[in-house]
Design a protein with these regions (language model features):
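N-terminal secretory signal peptides that target proteins for export/translocation
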Residues: 1-7
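Bacterial N-terminal signal peptides
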Residues: 8-21
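Extracellular/lumenal and peripheral-membrane lipid-interaction modules
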Residues: 23-201
């Protein structure tokens, strides 16, 4: 997976918790007239890449803020998979709260249309994901706590069914609990209020 997507999605998070952003293989084409927050995020990602290339990376923490991450998504910093849009992230200690517009027709592409469970995950919905998130020892972990569709919480059994049948087959490393190797020699990722602190080693 492209390093920009790994940092901005797997460390910051909505779509990964749904299993969607794992398909974002490449950053979107650059555009002019970006916000200061977008440019700050871009500079920090470039720094992380350069620091990772050093024999001994500077362990000084790099902070990615909510405003920077949200601007990066909103202004096309990451080419999202079909069916995922309008990502907005918020955080508090150890927890990520992510909102997105999800078009399940685009995601499922007709699969499972004869299954009664399909009705719950059809059409376009406003989705909110709350997940515990952390990173230590070079490994990141995201554990989904709850998901709401249009303000109504999805029963856990229904969510597990959807993930098992429509997400994991396409993205084998994604589930209700997802662990992954942090990119760019990131040793730890601490989710705090309004920011994520990354340490490289």
């Amino acid at each position: 997976m492209n390093w920009r997507c790994m940092v901005s999605i797997k460390v910051a998070f909505v779509a990964l918790t749904l299993g969607m952003a794992a398909g974002a293989q490449h950053p979107a084409a650059p555009r002019d007239n970006h916000s200061a927050e977008f440019r700050a995020m871009e500079q920090k990602l470039a720094y992380l890449k350069l620091n990772a290339a050093k024999a001994h990376p500077d362990p000084k923490p790099t902070e990615l803020t909510e405003a920077e991450a949200n601007a990066y998504f909103a202004e096309g910093g990451v080419k999202l998979p079909k069916g995922v849009s309008q990502i907005h992230l918020a955080s508090r200690p150890g927890v990520l709260d992510a909102h997105a517009k999800i078009d399940f027709e685009e995601i499922m592409q007709g699969r499972g249309s004869n299954n009664p469970m399909y009705a719950m995950f059809s059409g376009k919905h406003d989705v909110e994901v709350v997940a515990q998130a952390s990173g230590a020892g070079g490994t990141g972990s995201i554990q989904v706590q709850s998901i709401q569709l249009d303000g109504s919480e999805v029963p856990r059994w229904a969510l597990e069914f959807f993930v098992q049948h429509y997400i994991t087959p396409k993205y084998p490393n994604v589930g209700m609990t997802t662990t992954f190797k942090l990119p760019l020699r990131i040793e730890s990722a601490a989710v705090e209020t309004g920011r994520v602190r990354l340490v490289q080693r």
